[in-house]
């Protein structure tokens, strides 16, 4: 099973994702969250199956595909729910109240949980539409 990691001294793969959160004063910030992965037998019924590096599973409540038109520009707003956003095509630019701005293109992943406070700005960047998947948790 995926959740049954092999006994290894330390994870073999590390990555991170940006988290967008609201501090107690209502301002928003980015924080890079580390993710550790360990090898698991992902296909246990397949003899000789290669190991796959996997992080701990997280429960999710909804998965939604969305399309942002070229020129989409949402002024300051809190996130509608705690969710990961995966950019499939196009690009997104997020700005938080401390002034930091980050851009995400195809393959980009970030987590928003600023469901209270001043929120963030979201813009579709580039000349075409932006396709995203949101995964609520």
Regions from the PLM with identified roles:
Residues 23-24, 97:
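Short, ordered coil/turn segments that flank beta-strands lining enzyme active or ligand-binding pockets
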Residues 73, 78, 84-105:
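A short beta-strand-loop-beta hairpin characteristic of the jelly-roll/cupin
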Residues 111-115, 125-137:
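A short hydrophobic beta-strand segment most commonly corresponding to one strand
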């Amino acid at each position: 099973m995926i959740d049954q990691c092999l006994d290894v001294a330390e994870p073999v793969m590390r990555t991170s994702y940006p988290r967008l959160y609201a501090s107690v004063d209502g301002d928003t910030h980015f924080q890079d969250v580390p993710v550790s992965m360990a090898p698991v037998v992902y296909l246990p019924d397949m003899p000789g199956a290669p190991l796959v590096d996997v992080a701990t599973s997280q429960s999710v409540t909804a998965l939604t595909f969305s399309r942002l038109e070229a020129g989409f520009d949402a002024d300051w707003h809190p996130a509608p729910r705690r969710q990961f956003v995966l950019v499939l095509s196009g690009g997104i630019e997020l700005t938080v109240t401390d002034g930091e701005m980050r851009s995400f293109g195809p393959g980009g992943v970030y987590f928003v949980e600023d469901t209270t406070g001043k929120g963030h700005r979201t813009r579709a960047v580039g000349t075409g539409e932006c396709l995203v998947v949101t995964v609520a948790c």
